[in-house]
Curated annotation (Swiss-Prot):
One of its GO terms (cellular component) is cytosol. Involved in the gluconeogenesis. Catalyzes the conversion of oxaloacetate (OAA) to phosphoenolpyruvate (PEP) through direct phosphoryl transfer between the nucleoside triphosphate and OAA. Keywords: ATP-binding, Cytoplasm, Decarboxylase, Gluconeogenesis, Lyase, Manganese, Metal-binding, Nucleotide-binding. It is found in: Cytoplasm. Mn(2+) binds at residues 213, 232, 269. Monomer. This is Phosphoenolpyruvate carboxykinase (ATP).
Length: 541
């Protein structure tokens, strides 16, 4: 076996990972090497990379254009039995498997990767050396190696020389599981984790995000048990060193609002909060590109150049990209190293404690105020609720709101009971003297969405502290404290009741939404912490 490396780091032994007969190992190859490897003329199918006019390579991930939550499994053993938030305890994707089934799945992956020419990427998940995971990703596909080189934190040559993995990811995308029915699994595809062995294995799916989000789920297990908040949020820092974090589900404005020319980006998706402050888990960004334009999102557009990797976009014959084409998927993506963004914090990916915590929601019911200041109990309640809503059009042009509740604004990646994340977050906030705000970027009684100008004015008022000087009143039913006036924000929208010609209309919609909140929160009342928070939510007399 030969080991090609861009450093003189010690050779690595893959037999300890169950891989034998490996013909060649390309360990942490340069971007230049990866570009050559992923665009080789002989490559076919999903291995083939296409060079676009922007200089970045584009790949197709086949039918898997997003994560496969129904194919996610975790070994239930002495390590996880009493700590994991299992699928039978709540509506989640943490489905248990036995060590016997794990051994069979792992055998499929090690057989697939043995005897092959392999790419090995060693990187870090977490910018804090004290708590980061040293992750080794093993794959036979060049662009998958490129993806994780972009997304994980890249070690220095000195760090590589002594690198020992805490966690190993083996991606056997080309193999599937023929015995899935007999094993009681969902399909022939699998994304499985063993916390005792500290290994993730992948079979059947080519989607790059499984590797990134897999390690996020593991950080979500390991960090809160040490009292460190693990968060699905974006983060930025102002000129005075003031840090803000933005939680929000897809479509609420998390990326748009945290990308601010007046503030430096810490990261766009996954962060921790420890005794030193906020830190990014990642070394790159994974941005949606559907309907991307240079005018609307110049930072992301300009990041798409050599070393960026596009997924599932339509590339025309001349190499130009049709970002408006969602025929493969609406979830078209690009990964790129974080240094492709100009306005990033230095040193990269770390800053002090957060002073402002912003929960973004897009309320399509037209009930919630555009901004509310939350008490610590309300902070936990709304963090656990993780509410947003979308408008789905019907054939007669009527629009019906569809609510989504996702605990901690990232339920798909939680591995402990949601109340544990809320407790750790609020403890960190209280120690730092941080304030929390609920910001609604959705609709009101006018039937229109709250303007981006008003929302930006609200965010500015939160960040500069002027919102805390404003006079306030309390909105009934939800008991939310709202300002009467804010600089650069239309005062007529601050109380949502004022946006309706008939205030009774707001009341009937508010009752409907309050009931949905109450019914959703019922699942968290299986422990004392959850029960104690019911009073912080909406109240119906």
């Amino acid at each position: 076996m030969t080991v090609m490396e861009h450093t003189k780091a010690a050779q690595i032994d893959l037999t300890k990972h169950g891989l034998t007969g490996v013909t060649e190992v390309l360990r942490n190859p340069s971007y230049e090497q990866l570009f050559v490897e992923e665009t080789l003329p002989g490559l076919e199918g999903y291995e083939k990379g296409v060079v676009t006019e922007l200089g970045s390579v584009a790949v197709d991930t086949g039918i898997f254009t997003g994560r496969s939550p129904k194919d996610k499994y975790i070994v239930k053993d002495d390590t996880t039995r009493d700590t994991m938030w299992w699928s039978d305890q709540g509506k989640n994707d943490n489905k248990p498997i036995t060590t016997e089934v794990w051994d069979e799945l792992k055998e499929l992956v090690t057989t697939q990767l043995s005897g092959k020419r392999l790419f090995v990427i060693d990187g870090y998940c977490g910018a804090n050396p004290d708590t980061r995971l040293s992750v080794r990703i093993i794959t036979e596909v060049a662009w998958q190696a490129h993806f994780v080189k972009n997304m994980f934190i890249r070690p220095t040559d000195e760090e590589l020389a002594t690198f020992e993995p805490d966690f190993v990811v083996m991606n056997g995308a080309k193999t599937t599981n023929p015995n899935w029915e007999k094993q009681g699994l969902n399909s022939e595809n699998f994304v499985a984790f063993n916390l005792t062995e500290r290994v993730q294995i992948i079979g059947g799916t080519w989607y790059g995000g499984e590797m990134k989000k897999g390690m996020f789920a593991m950080m979500n297990y390991l960090l809160p048990l040490q009292g460190i908040a693990s968060m699905h949020c974006s983060a930025n820092v102002g000129e005075e060193g003031d840090v803000a974090i933005f939680f929000g589900l897809s479509g609420t404005g998390k990326t748009t609002l945290s990308t601010d020319p007046k503030r430096e980006l810490i990261g766009d998706d996954e962060h921790g909060w420890d005794d030193d402050g906020i830190f990014n888990f990642e070394g790159g960004c994974y941005a949606k590109t559907i309907r991307l334009s240079k005018e609307a999102e110049p930072e992301i557009y300009n990041a798409i150049r050599r070393d960026a990797l596009l997924e599932n976009v339509t590339v025309r014959g001349d190499g130009s990209i049709d970002f408006d084409d969602g025929s493969k998927t609406e979830n078209t993506r690009v990964s790129y190293p974080i240094h492709h963004i100009d306005n990033i914090v230095k040193p990269v990916s770390k800053a002090g404690h957060a002073q402002k915590v912003i929960f973004l929601t897009a309320d399509a019911f037209g009930v919630l105020p555009p901004v509310s200041k939350l008490t610590p109990e309300q902070t936990k309640y709304h963090f656990l609720s993780g509410f947003t809503a979308k408008l789905a059009g019907t054939e007669r042009g009527i629009t019906e709101p569809t609510p989504t509740f996702s605990a901690a604004f990232g339920a798909a990646f939680l591995t402990l009971h949601p109340t544990q994340y809320a407790e750790v977050l609020v403890k960190r906030m209280e120690a730092a003297g941080a304030e929390a705000y609920l910001v609604n970027t959705g609709w009101n009684g006018t039937g229109k969405r709250i303007s981006i100008q008003d929302t930006r004015g609200i965010i500015d008022a939160i960040l500069d502290g002027s919102i805390d000087q404003a006079e306030t009143k309390v909105i009934p039913m939800f008991n939310l404290e709202v300002p009467l006036a804010l600089h650069d924000v239309d005062p007529a929208i601050l109380d949502p009741r004022d946006t309706y010609t008939d205030p009774l209309q707001w009341e009937s919609k508010a009752k409907d939404l309050a009931e949905r909140f109450i019914n959703n929160f019922d699942k968290y009342t299986d422990n004392a912490e959850g029960k104690s928070l019911v009073a912080a939510g909406p109240q119906l007399d």
